[in-house]
Curated annotation (Swiss-Prot):
Residues 144-206 are annotated as: Disordered. Contains 1 atypical KH domain, which is still capable of binding RNA. Residues 1-40 are annotated as: Involved in RNA binding. The keyword Protein biosynthesis does not apply. The gene is KHDC3L. The modification Phosphothreonine is found at residue 145. This is KH domain-containing protein 3. One of its GO terms (cellular component) is nucleus. It comes from Macaca mulatta.
Length: 206
């Protein structure tokens, strides 16, 4: 029984020598439906690494299943440290096109999921900030209302007492001053009146 062979020169054959390539996963095995001439014309798709992980799995464990169902070979290279990966699709041209469409549809689907997740997170942040602002405004209004009530209570309790005390003091002072001012005049008038009466009275002679 023949041992399945690999393609040790696949990356060297299809990639420029100057391009730094990090191979992710193993080189594909040869299947009965795969012909060596398919290595000459690969289709290339470039995606973010996180999308490649979503589509094929973190360890590329879904690649064998896709290869068997689509009768193509898939090889993934990481081209740069910024998170971009290159997917090489080998096989019949029609199968290559179908596989690339499937990959791009899955990539769009995962992008939409991420956008929805980001939108929900943003909406939650906005709602939290609005709640904090409303809570702060409510606390400020309540504090202001309480202070206004305290001020009104202090004013209501203090003002009548002070007014009554002030009025009483003013009345007593006015009465004292009035009595003091009128007493000498009244006394003088009384003395003068009595003196006049005594003068007008007839003198009884013996």
């Amino acid at each position: 029984m023949d041992t399945p062979r690999r393609f040790p020169t696949l990356v060297q054959l299809m990639q420029p020598k100057a391009m730094p390539v990090e191979v992710l996963g193993h080189l594909p095995k040869r299947f009965s439906w795969f012909h060596s001439e398919f290595l000459k014309n690969p289709k290339v798709v470039r995606l973010e690494v996180w999308l490649v992980e979503k589509i094929f799995g973190r360890d590329r464990e879904r690649i064998p299943h896709v290869q068997g169902m689509s009768q193509i070979l898939i090889h993934v290279n990481r081209l740069d440290p910024n998170g971009e990966a290159e997917i090489l699709v080998f096989g019949r041209p029609s199968y290559q096109e179908d596989t690339i469409k499937m990959i791009m549809n899955l990539a769009d689907y995962h992008r939409q999921l991420q956008a929805k997740g980001s939108g929900k997170a943003l909406a939650q942040d906005v709602a939290t900030k609005k709640a904090e602002i409303q809570l702060s405004s409510t606390e400020v209004r309540e504090a202001g209302t309480q202070r206004s009530v305290e001020v009104r209570e202090v004013g209501t309790q203090g003002s009548p007492v002070e007014v009554r005390e002030t009025g009483t003091q003013q009345s007593l002072e006015a009465a004292n001053q009035s009595g003091t001012q009128r007493s000498p005049e009244a006394a003088s008038k009384a003395v003068t009146q009595r003196f006049s009466e005594d003068t007008r009275a007839p003198v009884t002679r013996l």
